[in-house]
């Protein structure tokens, strides 16, 4: 459960693949989280981009748990902690 703790406590974060991809492109994402049960065509381009930019990717078990860790009631395929 440790990976969620950092995300929960993060002051700034992105929720969802569109916002998270933008943060990676702008070099503001510190750590990216992707859900194992998300559609591969949704998260694979994001994971590839993170590798290119040298950003750590943490894979978590479920979209629902990732969403909850972000404080939303629905699932999220990805999220990121944004550097201050």
Regions found by a protein language model. Name each.
Residues 31, 40-58, 65:
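Amphipathic, hydrophobic secondary-structure cores in small proteins
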Residues 28-31, 76-78:
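Short, surface-exposed beta-edge/turn micro-motifs
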Residues 37-38, 84:
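Short glycine-rich anion-binding loops that position phosphate/pyrophosphate groups of nucleotides
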Residues 21-22, 46, 70:
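Short, flexible, solvent-exposed loop/turn segments with mixed acidic/basic and small polar residues
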Residues 55-84:
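C-terminal structural segments of small proteins and small subunits
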Residues 1-30, 39:
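Ribosome large-subunit tunnel/peptidyl-transferase-proximal elements
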Residues 9, 35, 55:
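Glycine- and other small-residue-rich loops at beta-strand/loop junctions that grip anionic moieties
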């Amino acid at each position: 459960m440790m990976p969620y703790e950092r995300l929960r406590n993060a002051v700034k974060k992105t929720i969802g693949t569109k916002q998270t991809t933008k943060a990676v492109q702008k070099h503001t994402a510190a750590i990216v989280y992707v859900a194992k049960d998300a559609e591969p065509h949704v998260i694979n381009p994001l994971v590839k981009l993170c590798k290119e930019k040298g950003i750590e990717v943490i894979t978590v078990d479920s979209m629902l748990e990732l969403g909850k860790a972000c404080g939303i009631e629905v699932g999220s395929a990805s999220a990121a902690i944004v550097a201050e």
